[in-house]
Amino acid sequence: MNSTEIMADLSSHTPMMQQYLKVKKDYQHALLFYRMGDFYELFFEDAHLAAKLLGITLTHRGKANGNPIPMAGVPYHSAEGYLARLVKAGRTVAICEQVGEVTGKGPVERKVVRILTPGTLTDDALLTSYQSSNLVALCIHQNQIGFALLDLSAGIFKVQQQDYKPEQLPIELARLMPSEILIDEDLVDPNIIEQIKKHLDCPVTKRPNVDFNLNNAQKTLCDQFSVSTLSGFGLDPLPLAKAAAAALIHYAKETQKTALPHIRSILLEQSTDFIALDPITRRNLEIIEPLFEHGTSLFQLVNDCQTAMGGRLLSRTLMQPVRDTALLDARLDAIEQLIQGYHESPVRLVLKEIGDIERVLSRVALGSARPRDLVQLRHACAQIPFLRNALAPVVQAKKSKLLGQLDQELGDFKSLHQHLMAAIVENPPVLLRDGNVIAEGYDAELDELRQIRDHAGQFLIDLEIKERERTGISTLKIGYNRVSGYYIELTRAQAEQAPADYIRRQTLKNAERYITPELKSFEDKVLSSESRALAREKALFEALLENLRENIAHLQMMSSAIAQIDVIANFAHQARLNNWARPEFTPETGIKIQGGRHPVVEALSKAPFTPNDTFLDVQHRMAIITGPNMGGKSTFMRQTALISLLAYCGSYVPARAAKLGPIDRIFTRIGSADDLSTGKSTFMVEMTETSQILHHATNQSLVLMDEVGRGTSTYDGLSLAWACVVDLTKRVKCLCLFATHYFELTELGSEPGIDNYHVTAQELNGNLILLHKVQQGPASQSHGLQVAKLAGIPANVIKEAQKRLRILEKQQQQHLQTSVQSDLFATLDSEVTPSIQVIEKVIEVEVSSPALDLLKQIEVDNLTPRQALEQLYELKAALNS
């Protein structure tokens, strides 16, 4: 039984359930949190789902069509934890609050006040400190695609439009790090959704076509920014980008139930502004998340930012390294100036005192800020003079234009700080409804209401004394009951002495009770003072928020400047702490790294890290790296990529020196496992990744390839690896580090553009010592058995392996003396099948073969024993063919 089935006949339900069903009708896509007193209740199918996802008790309330109505609930005061779990699970939640007064006639008025979705979160309780809530929209038309990103919690809004290439979609989306993706329900190819879900762990929400309407998009955005044209934003020739952006505005307003005053501008980006990193590369390099549960990512290592907004900016910076060397040098100049004068330490000490102002301002703009948010903002305003003072030596030296600019953007918020000091108590309660948020002395009316509320007894004592003196009646007394309210009581004998302003309220057997205008005024005030004081506080608090919204642009600029200063100071701190060097950029193709180190491995290793040099340029594009397992080949390749990545993020790098030419993309093919979800073998996964590289790498790409071809037979794998080296060197002309156990590939070291390197190792008394040093020339042997010995393989197994190795080496030597070398190891000038065709053929063969096709056709349940035997013979024949 669900709510949809019983909506046809509402008359059979209680008024409360009728109200619930009417609200639920408009929010079928969401879990409806329906406020009832101190609980949020869920009914029907929502109750079943919530009980399952949250582990809460499923009960019943009333009946529908003769059946008990399922119900589950969570306490109002602890709802945020439950909401966070539901949103993390990709669910949408509609919050339905009581907005009317309890009258005793029918259910209290309720309405949905906001909708929580994974891409529209702003509350700290629903987000981790370094987690962005990125809402992304796609608009595809013909051969073009528009992207738009909105982070409501940070006020970030940006777009781009480019040629639509399906294989590029995962790369762009990975850079944007979406929490939720909006698509047009009418226009999207189902394959797009499948591709998104394959590469990204985020929900895809289908939206009405009207939200993406190209004709309405211009007006939607102009209304949002209060402008008559979008020319100033550079969006005129980009209709799909505008449509995607407009869809985000519609969705955000619908979920927040309010305007978006903190979304004041929009940034136009180009994909060519950044170094492209596909999802595989991001994962293999462990940029944000480690490969294993207890591992350490690059972000986790280098993030010692003092503010949450600085940490989020650092995360975005690492995920989208920029190619503008002027911007990079500006960042590096700022880092250098902080390092030279030891200025990063005092800057970081001040930053540590600043809260998450970025999110506070978003909540202010959306009307969901709480009292302690304003305390955070007040404290941040107080820290600005100290931060500018810490930056002053660098700013005054005028050697970093970027820090000078950021110093100006910090602004001066002395008057705002004073206003907030006067308005908000030092330690307000968490929620405004608890009262006592507005400071004493800020508002005369509120002070009077509190005075009445808190000192009613004393007022009555004083009034009683005053009235006795005025009337001369010493037995006059003032009292109160719930029926009559406040009253002045006189005996019947004294009633004749009552002043003219005494108004008879009640007559008793032996007394008369009166009310005066003064007492009536007091009664009205005291009986409503609690609720009126709270209402007044709410009005004053909303006025404060409105005042802040009027200054939101300057406050957001201050917040952004703090985040940027934090990232720069963090990079300076890492450089000093870890002895990193400033990289140089050159327009000439190449990577030259002296004494490079892997930042994460070095930090976590107890032993001293062995630094290595990397040298690639137009004359030396390909480095074939051989040597034993555990020798450091993968570490060396990854450190080259991470050093390049950090440099293009504007950071110092873990090396003695580094000089880098242009890089448009970084590719990695390192390690694979079976993809059980798609039925792909390890080898198939490897070939698919390799195919992507061969199709999309350019002469400005950095490519890392590790053990290509190892998942198949020796000669198949060797042939594929050989063809890849040839193609990457001769056709693609990228910069490539190619690690392999196929020693035959070292024959290519004599060809133009290809060099051999090896990781060094020594045998001492039968034991292998790994030196982790990369040197020129091929490795002399693989040391595979010695590595197996180090891993604890039993001695008898090692001994048997040594015997077999000697036999195989002898056989291989005899075989190589015949025709293999002349056929397989042709020079680059020979006719070589392009490696892309080779890879695609392998993929085709794995996906479809005569034996596999025959096997698929067999109906196992219908075979007789004789037919089964015949089928086996056919399968064997197909395999042999």
UniProtKB/Swiss-Prot annotation:
UniProt binding sites for ATP: 627-634
Record InterPro entries: DNA_mismatch_repair_MutS, DNA_mismatch_repair_MutS-lik_N, DNA_mismatch_repair_MutS/MSH, DNA_mismatch_repair_MutS_C, DNA_mismatch_repair_MutS_clamp, DNA_mismatch_repair_MutS_core, DNA_mismatch_repair_MutS_N, DNA_mismatch_repair_MutS_sf
GO biological process: one example: mismatch repair
Domain of life (superkingdom): Bacteria
GO (cellular component) term, any one: cytosol
SUPFAM superfamilies: DNA repair protein MutS, domain I, DNA repair protein MutS, domain II, DNA repair protein MutS, domain III, P-loop containing nucleoside triphosphate hydrolases
GO MF annotation, one: mismatched DNA binding
Listed SMART domains: MUTSac, MUTSd
Alphabetized UniProt keyword annotations: ATP-binding, DNA damage, DNA repair, DNA-binding, Nucleotide-binding
Matches recorded under PROSITE patterns: DNA_MISMATCH_REPAIR_2
Pfam families, per database record: MutS_I (PF01624), MutS_II (PF05188), MutS_III (PF05192), MutS_IV (PF05190), MutS_V (PF00488)
Function description: This protein is involved in the repair of mismatches in DNA. It is possible that it carries out the mismatch recognition step. This protein has a weak ATPase activity.
NCBIfam families: mutS1 (TIGR01070), PRK05399.1 (NF003810)
UniProt similarity note: Belongs to the DNA mismatch repair MutS family.
Official protein name in the record: DNA mismatch repair protein MutS
Lineage: Bacteria, Pseudomonadati, Pseudomonadota, Gammaproteobacteria, Moraxellales
Gene: mutS
